[in-house]
Amino acid sequence: MKISIIGPGLMPIPPKGWGAVESLIWDMANALKDLGQEVQIINTTDPNKVLAAIKEFDPDFVHINYDDFIVLYPHIDKPKAMTSHFGYLERPDMMNGYVNIFNKFQEIRPNVFCLSEGIKNIYKVFSNFPEEKLFVTPNGVNVDAFNFKEEPAHPHRSMYLAKVDYRKRQHLFQNIDSLWFAGNIVDERYDTKNNYLGEWSKEQLYKELTDYGNLVLLSDGEAHSLVIMEAFAAGLGVVISEYARANLDLDKKFITLLPEKKINVID
């Protein structure tokens, strides 16, 4: 089977550092190849080049992983599906300009690989999607890539590993002595003087994440966060916000959920 996977084209695949969607696409492609499938990764911002690459490869199936390319969906004459990785998909009140893309999904009604049941319900309730077009397919992780230690080097340290931005809310927690941060910074409110480790490479992620006791992810919006799966692969527990709970069994002792009402009083 020949499969085309379409990425955003905004950074390399595989990424050198930050880039969850790009990492997912790379791991997905390699997993499919291991199963004997022929896989094409298309990673360009030019929609005409996307369509040309699909035509040349002549795949049996096309998987689009970039919401903006919903406009290409009617122009692809192959079996196909979309996956949205938009962090606020379960929070319509936070969509802002994304609502235009969401409305396009409603208009076109593509097949959608939903990252959680919650996301599936959003499409059903807000866009009246037919059930047969929605498929729940949570993210996975390449567990073989991660170093694992029974005894971490820093068991009393927690790691906040994510792009430092408004959605992830790192600035609210940067004065916690036991919390360390890694990720590229796009939030000017964050002070790099406090336990900041810079932007980790993929090699650092695979090797060093296991050295910490827990992963912290207290975003105000998530789809199905890859970094949580990476934390599990490296042997960490997780401390999460209500918005990062997708696909998790909250009865597990290594998963701690902080209610939103307590987010601003953490010390």
Regions found by a protein language model. Name each.
Residues I3-S4, F61-I64, P74-P92, V112-F113:
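Active-site proximal beta-strand in glycosyltransferases
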Residues D220:
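Aromatic "clamp/platform" in nucleotide-sugar-dependent glycosyltransferases that forms part
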Residues F113, E150-K168, Q174-W180:
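Conserved donor-binding/catalytic core segment of Leloir-type glycosyltransferases
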Residues P92, E107-K133, V141:
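A short, active-site helix/loop in glycosyltransferases that binds the activated sugar's phosphate group
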Residues G237-S241, N247:
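Short hydrophobic beta-strand element within catalytic cores of glycosyltransferases
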Residues P92-M94, K124, P138-H156:
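Acidic anion/phosphate-binding donor-loop and adjacent secondary structure
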Residues G118-I119, T137-F146, I185-D187:
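Short beta-strand->alpha-helix junction loop in the catalytic core
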